[in-house]
């Protein structure tokens, strides 16, 4: 296969389809989503058979249990896909929405209209559920999509793509509006991320090595985040009960997510009251504690152990595991400085009863999501009321934080007049 020619053809067809899908009615888009949902339920056995072949190959290659679990399309996973499609169909359609209309002295009205981005390339690892999630959000937001999943999920993604195409056709929409790259060749990714004439934005969903490669090689703009080095700072004016609840949930609710706390900062004045019960709780749950000298002194005095001495690298590490770095700081100044120096601008939280300090933390911490008296785990499109998300961005341009339907659109200016001319 000539990968360059193949991907160029995919891009050309996506660009053509994007013009049709951009003007599709809400009813047609919702009909397509419902048709895909019904098709998944109808063809569940065929989907599971294709997926079983992917799973068997993954096991033969020695992939671990966590990888295989993400790859597997269980009955529960298929049900979640169907529910997700129907849930996206219930979301308000942002396309064509007018805002900020104002009359100008000249007599014209100036405002903004929300429009699709165009063609979105989604690059992700071997998680077939992303095929449906991404296709649904891009379709509802009026965008064409090129999906390039991990090679281990190729049969699963191909089977899902067939059903998506059927759903689009049933609703009278172009099947090329959602295309799955049908090759495992890595050169396809290299071509996709440089096709500026056909692709408007890339959304990568994957590990750090994938994101780093795309940062270095992509010519198409990206909506992305590299790391989730999230912090909770417990202020010396915090409620101890709230601190324990927030810090427990932020770390132990799920270890492998990008919005899990990786570093705990505690004000010196409240450290014994907070770290003594927290340290015991974390050790009971099997969390390894990597601590600075001050935190070690407090925890050892409380009989908490074993402990590991933290290095500078620990403050820069996204563990995605039951490991937590702990540092005692003098106060909010030091906490904000540490977060802005070592954090990844993803999600950070303060626990405090002091309103002025809370507002200062919100203003000065340079992250996509900043929270007061709440777990970092809330940094999620569903929890934020977006309905669904295609990912989380810690960049500052275009979309920042959880990226839902509006994050897959842009605003253009519109002018309404009555024959006015500029003087």
UniProtKB/Swiss-Prot annotation:
Keywords: Amino-acid biosynthesis, Cytoplasm, NADP, Oxidoreductase, Proline biosynthesis
Gene3D superfamilies (UniProt xref): Aldehyde Dehydrogenase, Chain A, domain 1, Aldehyde Dehydrogenase, Chain A, domain 2
Source domain of life: Bacteria
EC code: 1.2.1.41
SUPFAM superfamilies documented for this protein: ALDH-like
Record-level GO BP terms: L-proline biosynthetic process
Gene Ontology CC annotations of this record: cytoplasm
Record's subcellular location: Cytoplasm
Pathway: Amino-acid biosynthesis; L-proline biosynthesis; L-glutamate 5-semialdehyde from L-glutamate: step 2/2
EC class (word): oxidoreductase
Record InterPro entries: Ald_DH/histidinol_DH, Ald_DH_C, Ald_DH_N, Aldehyde_DH_dom, G-glutamylP_reductase_CS, Glu-5-SA_DH, GPR_dom
Catalytic activity: L-glutamate 5-semialdehyde + phosphate + NADP(+) = L-glutamyl 5-phosphate + NADPH + H(+)
Entry's Gene Ontology molecular function annotations: glutamate-5-semialdehyde dehydrogenase activity; NADP binding
Function recorded in the entry: Catalyzes the NADPH-dependent reduction of L-glutamate 5-phosphate into L-glutamate 5-semialdehyde and phosphate. The product spontaneously undergoes cyclization to form 1-pyrroline-5-carboxylate.
Family: Belongs to the gamma-glutamyl phosphate reductase family.
Full protein name: Gamma-glutamyl phosphate reductase
Organism: Burkholderia mallei (strain ATCC 23344)
Gene: proA
């Amino acid at each position: 296969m000539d990968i360059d020619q193949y991907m160029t053809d995919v891009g050309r067809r996506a660009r053509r389809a994007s013009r049709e899908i951009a003007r599709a009615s809400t009813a047609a888009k919702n009909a397509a989503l419902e048709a895909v949902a019904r098709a998944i339920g109808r063809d569940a056995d065929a989907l599971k058979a294709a997926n079983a072949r992917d799973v068997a190959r993954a096991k033969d290659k020695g992939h671990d249990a966590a990888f295989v679990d993400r790859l597997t399309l269980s009955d529960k996973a298929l049900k979640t896909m169907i529910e997700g499609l129907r849930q996206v169909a219930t979301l308000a359609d942002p396309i064509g929405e007018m805002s900020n209309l104002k009359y100008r002295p000249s007599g014209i009205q100036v405002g903004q209209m929300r429009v699709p981005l165009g063609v979105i390339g989604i690059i992700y690892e071997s998680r077939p559920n992303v095929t449906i999630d991404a296709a649904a959000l891009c379709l509802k937001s009026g965008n064409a999509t090129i999906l390039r999943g991990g090679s281990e999920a190729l049969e699963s993604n191909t089977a899902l793509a067939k059903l998506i195409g059927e759903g689009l056709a049933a609703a009278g929409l172009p099947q090329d509006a959602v295309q799955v790259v049908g090759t495992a060749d890595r050169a396809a990714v290299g071509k996709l991320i440089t096709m500026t004439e056909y692709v408007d934005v890339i959304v990568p969903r994957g590990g750090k090595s994938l994101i780093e490669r795309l940062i270095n090689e992509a010519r198409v703009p990206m909506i992305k985040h590299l790391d989730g080095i999230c912090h909770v700072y417990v202020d010396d004016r915090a409620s101890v009960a709230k601190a324990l609840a927030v810090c427990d949930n932020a770390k132990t609710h799920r270890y492998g997510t990008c919005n899990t706390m990786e570093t705990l900062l505690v004000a010196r004045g409240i450290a014994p009251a907070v770290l003594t019960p927290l340290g015991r709780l974390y050790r009971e749950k099997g969390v390894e504690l990597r601590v600075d000298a001050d935190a070690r002194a407090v925890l050892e005095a409380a009989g908490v152990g074993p402990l590991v001495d933290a290095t500078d690298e620990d403050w820069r590490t996204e563990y995605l595991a039951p490991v937590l770095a702990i540092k005692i700081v003098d106060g909010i100044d030091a906490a904000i400085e540490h977060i802005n120096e070592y954090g990844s601008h993803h999600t950070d939280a303060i626990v405090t009863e002091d309103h002025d300090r809370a507002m200062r933390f919100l203003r000065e911490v340079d992250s996509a999501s900043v929270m007061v008296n709440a777990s970092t785990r809330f940094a999620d499109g569903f929890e934020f009321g977006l309905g669904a998300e295609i990912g989380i961005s810690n960049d500052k341009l275009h979309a920042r934080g959880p990226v839902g339907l509006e994050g897959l659109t842009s605003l253009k200016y519109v002018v309404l007049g009555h024959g006015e001319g500029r003087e």
